[in-house]
A protein has these predicted regions:
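Sec-dependent signal peptide recognition
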Residues: 1-7
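Jelly-roll (double-stranded beta-helix
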Residues: 3, 13-203
Length: 203
């Protein structure tokens, strides 16, 4: 009975952990029915234990260190590098501390749906967006991430977005975010003048 009670208490604690955001050092950049996009900085402070309730992906845009504390209290110092991308499944539970004089920074996308929707526009009158001039840097069951260095300009050819997409453009390490619904036809990603851009195609 004591064991069962202890398990129930643990499950209750896990279910009642706060989400990772909002918190000090974060700014919400965009939210709609599909995603929440955050600009995240790891300040030199200890953050509460939290649980990632959504699958999430993103890109770091500065170098930086942080200390990750596991559920069991194990501490590990990690270094992240600017322009590395990532994808993690929901359920990650930990706490974090910024460990750099210049904070690690990144743009995080949280996917609200528990699984990919699989919505794809099949219209063929306009060529589909295929990351032309970009590089496919990561793909998972939830997202395809394209990197453009430099960012696409307004001289690009017209194309159709077959999937919903989040465009993140960086100018002097300042992110700008926009959402492009599937079926959109245009000639550019509104990233002219940016140093680089990332297109996150949502599956």
């Amino acid at each position: 009975m004591r064991f069962i009670a202890a398990v129930l208490v643990l499950l209750f604690q896990i279910e009642n952990l706060p989400p990772p955001y909002p918190r000090d050092g974060t700014t919400k950049l965009l939210e709609n029915d599909r995603v929440i996009v955050w600009d995240v900085s790891w300040l030199q402070q200890a953050y509460p234990v939290h649980r990632h309730v959504y699958d999430y992906a993103g890109v770091y845009y500065t170098n930086g260190d942080r200390i990750i504390v596991s559920e069991r209290g194990a501490r590990s110092r990690t270094t992240s590098v600017a322009w590395d991308t990532f994808f993690f499944r929901r359920g990650v539970t930990h706490s974090e501390e910024g460990a750099s004089d210049d904070p690690l920074r990144g743009v995080f996308l949280e996917f609200k749906e528990p699984a990919a929707l699989g919505v794809v526009d099949t219209e063929t009158t306009t060529p589909a967006f295929a990351g032309t001039a970009g590089r496919n840097v990561r793909e998972s069951e939830r997202v395809v991430i394209w990197e453009f260095v430099p960012a696409p300009d307004t001289a690009s050819s017209p194309h159709r977005h077959t999937r919903d997409a989040v465009v993140v453009a960086f100018t002097k390490l300042k992110p700008r975010v926009s959402f492009v619904p599937h079926g959109t036809v245009h000639a550019d990603e509104q990233t002219a003048g940016a140093d680089r851009a990332y297109v996150f195609e949502l599956k």
